[in-house]
């Protein structure tokens, strides 16, 4: 939690009796790492426990999620056997290192209960006191309020709830954070200037702009859209240095309607199949995806989109193709560098269990390393190089699909149909990656010899 000097604190306490957070920038970028307690129950490499967290790569680790008891309005353990009886919360705080250990209350199903609790003074008091008691008992350093789906009618009560936390946090070092949605319709439900005064940081859920619920494929978290969301909150009064940008450590996946229609905006017939660990349609954790790519490299075409700081893969089977939007260490490193340069507070990651925490594809935590190595004050460094183990390719080799360009070697190659389009093929973490480029206009064509765009009449067939 950001603090004034002792003198200023004394003046504020005398004048206001408040713990309101100042709007001054902090020096260290934040990496807010969300940990889902239920991943303890997964099997194999998908299982994760607090001891598996590398807290040197996170400034804040967030234990999620807690609820609110509908009858008593006290904070509620959602898995009491794991959290309490198996001492999972204690293990979490005991292994926090130098990171701030926080709890997250709420989530996608808690909006109605938040509304009821925040509406009554006595309920607010009960909830906040029970939360502070739990944090103190188990050694937590702060709380994230994730009131998803908050309505405009709840705006004033949300501020009253934050004010109650502020009152109980007085003379402590507890950290206060809130999560804000990325949906345009929700922006004005939040009194952003007031919220900014009460919190140390705001976690903006700048992810899942599309997914398998849509009938066309696209980047799930394109950087321009993420920045647009952050700027929308900034225009409404949120200081940049108090906003962290959420990034996914998972992929959104689709089944393509036609195998030879693989571009952004092409139609999908449904969600991609479930992963081994996460067991969710249209969703793969990074550690599920990297294992799959390494096992069947020849079946994947990976395309990098520099304009959107994005990457996607097409995985071709014998009878269908999957379209996979994901993040890698290069996209995350570039985003970390750019948001730091623009004055934002850092990133939040969703979630640690989706990272390669066990190093099944190479070095441990490649995505977190990429973020941290590109953060500080816009200083550009190369992302940490991940050493990948030798890959044993399957004997299956996917036949090129007519109308779809595939990289077979490094270099620059003109499209066979549209001469003004060309492809750059270069080695990446998982084999050859393709980047699509276009000449300035349709009267030009790409010359593979000079590697420049020239008059199309000078190239036979163009």
From Swiss-Prot:
One of its GO terms (biological process) is carbohydrate metabolic process. Its main location: secreted. GO terms for molecular function: chitin binding; chitinase activity. Residues 1-25 form the signal peptide. Glycans are attached at residue 338. It is found in: Secreted. This is Chitinase-like mite allergen Der f 18.0101. The lineage of its organism: Eukaryota, Metazoa, Ecdysozoa, Arthropoda, Chelicerata. It comes from the Eukaryota. Keywords: Allergen, Chitin-binding, Disulfide bond, Glycoprotein, Secreted, Signal. Residues 29-378 form the GH18 domain. SUPFAM superfamilies: (Trans)glycosidases (SSF51445), Chitinase insertion domain (SSF54556). InterPro entries: Chitinase_II/V-like_cat, Chitinase_insertion_sf, Glyco_hydro18_cat, Glycoside_hydrolase_SF, Glycosyl_Hydrlase_18. Belongs to the glycosyl hydrolase 18 family. Chitinase class II subfamily.
């Amino acid at each position: 939690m950001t603090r004034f000097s002792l003198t200023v604190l004394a003046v504020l306490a005398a004048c206001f009796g408040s713990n309101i957070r100042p709007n001054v920038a902090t020096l260290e970028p934040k990496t807010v790492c969300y940990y889902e307690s239920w991943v303890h129950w997964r099997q194999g490499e998908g299982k994760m426990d607090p001891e598996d967290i590398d807290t040197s790569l996170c400034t804040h680790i967030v234990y999620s999620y807690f609820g609110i008891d509908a009858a008593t309005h006290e904070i509620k353990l959602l898995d009491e056997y794991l959290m309490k009886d198996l001492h999972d919360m204690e293990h979490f705080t005991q292994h926090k290192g130098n990171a701030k250990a926080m709890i997250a209350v709420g989530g996608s199903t808690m909006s109605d209960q938040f509304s009821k609790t925040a509406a009554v003074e006595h309920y607010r008091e009960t909830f906040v006191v029970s939360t502070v008691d739990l944090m103190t008992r188990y050694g937590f350093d702060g709380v994230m309020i994730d009131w998803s789906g908050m309505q405009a009618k709840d705006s004033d009560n949300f501020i009253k709830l934050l004010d109650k936390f502020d009152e109980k946090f007085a003379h402590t070092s507890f950290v206060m954070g809130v999560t804000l949605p990325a949906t345009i319709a929700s922006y004005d439900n939040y009194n952003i200037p007031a919220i900014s005064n009460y919190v140390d940081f705001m976690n903006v859920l700048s992810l899942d702009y599309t997914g398998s619920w849509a009938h066309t494929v696209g980047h799930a978290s394109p950087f321009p859209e993420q920045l647009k969301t952050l700027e929308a909150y900034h225009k409404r009064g949120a200081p940049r240095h108090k906003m962290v940008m959420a990034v996914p450590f998972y992929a959104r996946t689709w089944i393509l309607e036609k195998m030879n229609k693989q571009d952004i905006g092409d139609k999908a017939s449904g969600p991609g199949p479930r992963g081994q660990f996460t067991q969710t349609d249209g969703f793969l954790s990074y550690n599920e995806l990297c294992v799959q790519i390494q096992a069947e490299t020849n079946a994947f075409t990976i395309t990098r989109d520099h304009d959107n700081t994005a990457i996607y893969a097409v995985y071709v089977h014998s009878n269908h193709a999957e379209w996979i939007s994901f993040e890698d260490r290069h996209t995350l490193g570039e985003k970390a560098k750019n948001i730091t340069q623009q004055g934002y507070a850092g990133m939040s990651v969703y979630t640690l269990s989706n990272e390669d925490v066990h190093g099944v594809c190479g070095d441990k935590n490649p995505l977190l390393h990429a973020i941290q190595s590109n953060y500080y004050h816009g200083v550009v460094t190369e992302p940490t190089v991940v050493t990948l183990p030798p890959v044993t390719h399957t004997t299956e080799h996917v036949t090129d699909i007519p109308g779809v360009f595939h990289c077979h070697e490094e270099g620059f190659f003109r499209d066979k149909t549209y001469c003004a389009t060309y492809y750059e093929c270069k080695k990446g973490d998982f084999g050859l990656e393709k980047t699509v480029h276009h000449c300035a206009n349709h009267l030009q064509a790409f010359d593979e010899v000079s590697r420049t765009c020239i008059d199309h009449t000078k190239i036979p067939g163009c």
